[in-house]
Amino acid sequence: MAETDEPAFEDLHPIGTIGKIVRVLEMPDQTTTVIIQGMKRLELKNITETHPYLKGEVNIVEEEIPSKDDKEFQALVETCKDLTIRYIKSSDTLHQESAFAIKNLTNHMFLVDFICTNLPLKKDEKIELLRIDSLRERTYRLLEILN
């Protein structure tokens, strides 16, 4: 998708997230970092206003979440977790605090989405992961990318 100052519907990704600002940090280099927690995935149906900013009509995209008793899914998540921690530990560019956060996340959906968001994946891979409705399938695809 082309970058433009005046995007039309066709210039936007149809799937996105609604997020909650968790923290705003003023960094030593005079930049601002914002930590956002994704709440729900949304599908953009159409643009309803363009000025002074874009507004649109959206639908919430429901997640297909495996049951808590699903042992295969639990093993899949643990494998992704282990691979991600190994990747972070071998990286010179990723913060080691991320490994600590990943070790301590117990909610499978938050864990998978945290990994998808925070690893330096290609933009197309992140968009592909965001578009997958099934948490199980998203986790399988993440595992393929990690390998």
Where on the chain are the PLM-derived regions?
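N-terminal low-complexity, acidic/polar interaction/targeting segments
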Residues: 1-147
